[in-house]
Swiss-Prot record:
Its EC number is 4.2.1.9. Binds 1 [2Fe-2S] cluster per subunit. This cluster acts as a Lewis acid cofactor. This is Dihydroxy-acid dehydratase. It comes from Mycobacterium ulcerans (strain Agy99). Keywords: 2Fe-2S, Amino-acid biosynthesis, Branched-chain amino acid biosynthesis, Iron, Iron-sulfur, Lyase, Magnesium, Metal-binding. Functions in the biosynthesis of branched-chain amino acids. Catalyzes the dehydration of (2R,3R)-2,3-dihydroxy-3-methylpentanoate (2,3-dihydroxy-3-methylvalerate) into 2-oxo-3-methylpentanoate (2-oxo-3-methylvalerate) and of (2R)-2,3-dihydroxy-3-methylbutanoate (2,3-dihydroxyisovalerate) into 2-oxo-3-methylbutanoate (2-oxoisovalerate), the penultimate precursor to L-isoleucine and L-valine, respectively.
């Protein structure tokens, strides 16, 4: 088979008399005559100093470039943004989190297209930067490799009773709720705050970043075994160099992102997310990435796969372990091999190694599940996957609940309705949210929020207040990957689009049936329908800027909250 053209695009800026000015610019950044015959590789990084999630990317980008050079290419690094959900949580800043996913994808596309780069290595560490980079790869359909920054190690807090406790960032959110109810001292909150982030890396549990890193590996877009090692682990530098080499080999073989991101590959990613009991945000992001790859993927696919794939991983937020423990027992390949052997994974999917999933796993030969961090298929934590898709009179287009960790299937209670998260937090702090309540937080969807904010402040506070198993929370917004408890998000249609959630009133009875996959408001249908007459949505919160544009473009959470 003849080798593909390794400069399918960069000839536009390097070849011919009329490109003298472009070559002159490239000489100024270090290129010499012989470099103009090399493939030009964009090394896109979301490195910044705002959050620990991305701190390793500066180091890793250097190793990626070494790998590109070693393989005969020429790397050109550029940056994009990243928003820290941990810092932006619980205030106005969270409106800007999900839109950052689109900004990242758009900015990478813009640079890659404008500069005619031949391929890319995409580096990310924060929750929205991972899917944003993968969306860009799918949209561009060039030779691309994704590289994760790696997760943070757990911290150890020394509490006032003399005990020591392993903690992650989620413990801080829950400590706030406990302290506000008098269940924890301010000194212990301070001890937890100081311990939760002992260094660089993304939040350590199976929260959104680690879930999406695992999904990227299962999707075939990152090197096998690269998702689990911590950010500080020097194996990451090796994966970075190999990623730089891999993108050149993909160019030589003529393999592009959509050759890898097939429907079967997305089914593999969903299966791994289900086995891990990963973040509900993976539903939103995988739908969006599939949209960019021109792959038809729906909420029904998550239901279908989740009904077959058991929940195997005892990981936070519901379990005991973090990503570094997953790494200790062999990483994501252990999960993938377990699923492959059971016929729950497509082994013939192509990956960035140029080989198939099955071939990669045969070469790695991962160990069997250890039985603690990851259980065997014959002894799952739950018989079905850790995420369930719901439908019903309150969510005709769908809703999402994380079932990993739930110990009951049915919750029926009385609605307490709040237009926005802040009002719900105030009610919790006042002690007026009690056992049996169904807390409904609306006008927090993609358009209505805008930005579909994560509700970690309220869910963490509810758990910290000791109500995690006694209160059901519903929203057209999202939840953090660190959320625990009875929490249903992504309710669609959202309130601003006249979805049923807009017409729920205090005192309505609401029923969640996880096994039946239903979410219903039990109000008499004619009465409920009468409430919908003459509906007028609230005026847009933002009249100018990025969110004003976002509201005009963004679609339903049921299709990934994509813009166009």
């Amino acid at each position: 088979m003849p080798e593909a053209d390794i400069k399918p695009r960069s000839r536009d800026v390097t070849d011919g008399l009329e490109k003298a000015a472009a070559r002159g610019m490239l000489r100024a950044v270090g290129m010499v005559d012989e470099d103009f015959a090399k493939a030009q590789i964009g090394v896109a990084s979301s490195w910044n100093e705002i959050t620990p999630c991305n701190l390793s990317l500066d180091r890793l980008a250097k190793s990626v470039k070494e790998g590109v050079f070693a393989a005969g290419g020429y790397p050109l690094e550029f940056g994009t943004i990243s928003v820290s959900d941990g810092i932006s949580m619980g205030h106005e800043g969270m409106h800007f989190s999900l839109v950052s996913r689109e900004v990242i994808a758009d900015s990478v596309e813009t640079v890659m297209q404008a500069e005619r780069l031949d391929g890319s290595v995409l580096l990310a560490g924060c929750d929205k930067s991972l899917p944003g980079m993968l969306m860009a790869a799918a949209r561009l359909d060039l030779a691309s490799v994704f590289l994760y920054a790696g997760s943070i190690l757990p911290g150890v807090a020394k509490l006032s009773d003399g005990s020591e406790r392993e903690v992650t960032i989620i413990d801080a959110f829950e400590a706030v709720g406990a302290c506000s109810r008098g269940l924890m001292s301010r000194a212990d909150v301070d001890a937890i705050e100081r311990a939760i982030c002992p260094g660089e890396g993304a939040c350590g549990g199976m929260y959104t970043a680690n879930t999406m890193a695992s999904a990227a590996e299962a999707l075939g877009m990152s090197l096998p075994g690269s998702a689990a090692p911590p950010a500080t682990d020097r194996r990451r530098d090796g994966f970075a160099r190999q990623s730089g080499q891999a993108v050149i080999e993909l160019l030589r073989q003529g393999i592009t992102a959509r050759d890898i991101m097939t429907r079967e590959a997305f089914e593999n990613a969903i299966a791994v997310v289900m086995a891990f009991g990963g973040s509900t945000n993976a539903v939103l992001h995988l739908l969006a990435i599939a949209h960019e790859a021109n792959v038809e993927l729906t909420l029904d696919d998550f239901s279908r796969i989740g009904s077959k794939v058991p929940h195997l991983a005892d990981v936070k937020p519901f379990g005991r372990h973090v990503m570094s423990h997953v790494d200790h027992i062999g990483g994501v390949p252990v999960v993938m091999k377990t699923l492959l052997d059971a016929g729950l994974l497509h082994g013939d999917c192509l990956t960035v190694t140029g080989r198939t999933v099955a071939e990669n796993l045969e070469a790695i030969a991962p160990p069997d599940p250890d039985g603690k961090v990851l259980r065997a298929l014959i002894n799952p934590i739950h018989a079905t996957g850790g995420i369930t898709i719901l439908r019903g009179s309150l969510a005709p287009e769908g809703a999402v609940v994380k079932t990993a960790g739930l110990d009951t299937d049915v919750f029926e209670g009385t609605a307490r309705v709040f237009d926005g998260e802040r009002a719900a937090l105030d009610a919790l702090e006042d002690g007026t949210i009690t056992h049996g309540d169904v807390v409904v937080i609306r006008y927090e969807g993609p358009k209505g929020g805008p930005g579909m904010r994560e509700m970690l402040a309220i869910t963490g506070a509810i758990k910290g207040a000791g109500l995690g198993k006694d209160v059901l929370l519903l929203t057209d917004g999202r939840f953090s990957g660190g959320t625990t408890g009875f929490c249903v998000g992504h309710i669609a249609p959202e309130a601003v689009d006249a979805g049923p959630i807009a017409f729920v009133r205090d005192g309505d009875r609401i029923r969640l049936d996880v096994a039946g996959r239903t979410l219903d408001v039990l109000t008499d249908p004619p009465e409920f329908a009468a409430r919908q007459q003459n509906f007028t949505p609230p005026a847009p919160r933002y009249k100018t800027g990025v969110l004003a544009k976002y509201v005009k473009l963004v679609g339903s959470a049921a299709i990934g909250a994509v813009c166009g």
